[in-house]
Amino acid sequence: MAVGKNKRLSKGKKGLKKKVVDPFTRKEWYDIKAPSTFENRNVGKTLVNKSTGLKSASDALKGRVVEVCLADLQGSEDHSFRKVKLRVDDVQGKNLLTNFHGMDFTADKLRSMVRKWQTLIEANVTVKTSDEYIIRVFAIAFTRKQSNQVKRTAYAQSSHIRAIRKVISDILTREVSNSTLAQFTSKLIPEVINKEIENATKDIFPLQNVHIRKVKLLKQPKFDLGSLMALHGEGSAEEKGKKVSGFKDEVLETV
């Protein structure tokens, strides 16, 4: 009789369930921190696989983009139609330090502003900030009737549209080029630029619903940890390390 492996004995029993491993046991939570430009810095939490071997969790987290409602960052429902994108630039322990990556309007807000009997005017500029960020800013505006106007419609002529678009482009270029990215972000929240555009164009044609509807980050400078820490209020140029007093070893004359 030939001696060999019995194939029937090696087979396992049918119907046995495989051991199920919870995938969350291989993951860990990190806290997302918004820049100090916003009132509420605690954005939320995110998951990532734990560091194993050559794969580091911090490498998987860097560059991750999250989208947050501006109302949650400012604690006010007046900003609920704005969406802010934040990009993870560095990992400090269990905290993810983010930077501004873009801003956009919700679709329902844009649709609610489009109405009859008025002209829609759009403009966009690509400008470099004072700290070497290249961003593209999109603005939107609508015409409105004058105070003593009887006519129902408030349509603007092509010459008016071109003149208004030029004024908007000039204001956006000046505001962006003379500001850092953090300073420009702080101007978006109280809508300072929108009011300036309304006042500058009232002699050409009265406007309403003037908004910066979108900000897109095209290019960013080389990563600087010091500027990121200053943006989060966790570092200062005045902080310096203290000199530690040293000691001298006692030399023995005889051994």
From Swiss-Prot:
Residue positions where N-acetylalanine is found in the record: A2
BP-aspect Gene Ontology terms: translation
Alphabetized UniProt keyword annotations: Acetylation, Cytoplasm, Ribonucleoprotein, Ribosomal protein
MF term (GO), any: structural constituent of ribosome
Keyword Transcription: no
Main location per the UniProt record: cytoplasm
Record Pfam families: Ribosomal_S3Ae
Annotated GO CC locations: cytosolic small ribosomal subunit; fungal biofilm matrix
Disulfide linkage: none
UniProt subcellular location: Cytoplasm
Subunit structure: Component of the small ribosomal subunit. Mature ribosomes consist of a small (40S) and a large (60S) subunit. The 40S subunit contains about 33 different proteins and 1 molecule of RNA (18S). The 60S subunit contains about 49 different proteins and 3 molecules of RNA (25S, 5.8S and 5S).
Family: Belongs to the eukaryotic ribosomal protein eS1 family.
Protein name: Small ribosomal subunit protein eS1
Organism: Candida glabrata (strain ATCC 2001 / BCRC 20586 / JCM 3761 / NBRC 0622 / NRRL Y-65 / CBS 138) (Yeast)
